[in-house]
Amino acid sequence: CVRNYLMDMLKLEKWEKPSVKEYGSVDEILDEIVDFAVEKEIIPQSNAWRDLFDTRIMGVFTGMPHEVNAKFKEKYAKSPEAATDWYYAYSEDTNYVRKGRIAKDIRWKYDSEYGQLDITINRSKPEKDPRDIAAARNAVKVSYPACQLCMENTGFAGTLTHPARQNLRPIPMTIHGDKWGFQYSPYGYYNEHCIVFNSEHIPMKIDAEVFGKLFDITDMLPHYFVGSQAPLPIARGSFLL
């Protein structure tokens, strides 16, 4: 089934059993496949198109949302840490967490008068390709999903102005009686950087109720630290762990 999906994506009409080749990472495999797609003019050569295509490929290998959620619950029955260990590894294996790109970040520690600081220079996000910028300028504006932290991103094919999410599988959570989602960041700034977001696209603010929500999250995931960036003008309502 997976083979046939990939053959369809790559416009292949026949298949021959290949010789076994070892790769060092999923990035090497995807780069080779995407290079083939560019060579055969299946997609244009640009950073955005390459990301759209490699995410589409990994979506084929990603379990259905109910399967991923069931596995998380199974692990959670052992311990919250076992559940997040599994989910983070799964997010790396399906390339939602871009492990290879995150490794490019420059990190170091600095002993300041206020304590030890972790400093990061983010080099993991690819540079904007001029071809993508020009194409996005002329692209039809759409409002679905409403933002990059909406539950509707699950399985979304993506556009030149909105990243593909075929390999995204958020874990449903109930926080303060409302439905929320839990996922890792594709480009984490720190270890197991994750996000908890409201299932509804609504503005958030810092008030007394927020602290109750933060405590709910730490009750469910006691080995994580959580904070809120809700009032920041460039950030939609979410909690960072």
Place the predicted regions along the sequence by residue.
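A short acidic-Thr-Gly-centered motif at the start of a beta-strand
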Residues: 174, 216-220, 231-232
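Active-site microenvironments that recognize anionic phosphate/pyrophosphate groups
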Residues: 1-208
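Beta-sheet entry/capping signal
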Residues: 179, 223-226
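Long, well-ordered alpha-helical scaffolding segments within enzyme catalytic domains
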Residues: 206-223
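Short C-terminal domain-edge/linker segments immediately following a structured domain
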Residues: 148-154, 212-215, 226-228
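Histidine-centered divalent-metal-coordination microenvironment in nucleic-acid enzymes
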Residues: 193, 198, 228-241
